[in-house]
Structures are given as structure tokens and as C-alpha cells.
Amino acid sequence: MTTQKSKVETLHEEITNLYSVGIQALYEIEGVGHKALQILKSFTMANRKELIEKLPSWSNKDLEFLAFIVHDDFSETYDDKYLLGYIFTLANDSLAANLLDQWLIFFFEENTVESIALLDLMLNRLEGLQSNSYIDATTYQYWIEYLTNLKTKQQGL
């Protein structure tokens, strides 16, 4: 008897299948990550919770591909007020700085993060990026102020 894979396992498998095309192809070829995006869009709340629980064990490469799928520049995006920010907190310094530079600003223009805990994690991640010289003082200050203001709004202060 074979056990059926969870949707999270299916998504992870699809992401690892994308390794063969490479991350650059995701940037250049429309629709390459479409199947993975459709799997993600079919998630129930339970699937999403499982994904959040399993993401810390995913490789940085997995996180990079997932971040691209969440924010596909060519077509549709995955409307989530948490996932891209959470990936930012888990990624290594290089990927986190890249996410900050390329995608998070657009993410925040379109979404409001409602999790104060996530905003705290993101603020801590910024500290690490700045102390490891992955972002300059101006970028650091901008994001600290932005996230602090967002956090204040969420707290209703």
C-alpha cells in the first residue's frame, strides 16, 4: 500500500523538478513555475500550516524557487500576506538581501502583513543583514522604519 503525498510534499517535489531548468529560466521564461503555483493555490489552511511548519527544513535553493513562484513577474502571483515575508526570515543572507531588493517592496505595496510576530522576525532579519554588511545603512533604515510603522498600525497604536 502506498501512501499519498501531501500537497506540501507535491509542491516540494515540483520545486526540486524545477532545478533542472535553473533559477534563471524562471526569470526569463513565462509559465515555467505555473504547475508549482497551481499546487500552492490549491492549498487548504491545513496545507498552508504544514508548509509553514516544514519551510525551516527546506534548503536555501528550495526557498529561492518558492519565492519566485510566490512572486512570478510574468503572470499571476500568490496572494499571501505571510509567505514571502516568512521566506525572507529563513533565507541565507544573500537570498534575503536579494528578496529585500527585488520583491519585498512590491509585496508590501500589494499586501498588509497582519502577523506582528512575522514583522518582529523580519526586523530581526534586517539586523542580521545589516550587521553582516549585506545591506547598507540607508536600506536598513528605510526598512526598519517601514516595518516598525507597519507593526504600529497592526497594533492599533
Model segments located where?
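N-terminal "cap/leader" segments of large eukaryotic alpha-helical scaffolds
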Residues: 1-35
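Amphipathic alpha-helical scaffolding segments comprising HEAT/armadillo-like alpha-solenoid repeats
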Residues: 2-13, 42-54, 77-89, 113-123
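Eukaryotic acidic, Ser/Thr-rich intrinsically disordered low-complexity regions
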Residues: 2-5, 119-157
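Alpha-solenoid helical repeat architecture
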Residues: 19-27, 40, 54-59, 88-94, ...
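Structural detector for internal amphipathic alpha-helices that build alpha-solenoid repeat scaffolds
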Residues: 27-42, 56, 64-76, 98-113, ...
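Structural detector for tandem alpha-solenoid helical repeats, activating at a conserved register
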Residues: 46, 61, 95-98
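Residues at alpha-helix boundaries and short interhelical turns
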Residues: 74-77, 94, 130, 134
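A mid-sequence interfacial segment
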Residues: 87-127
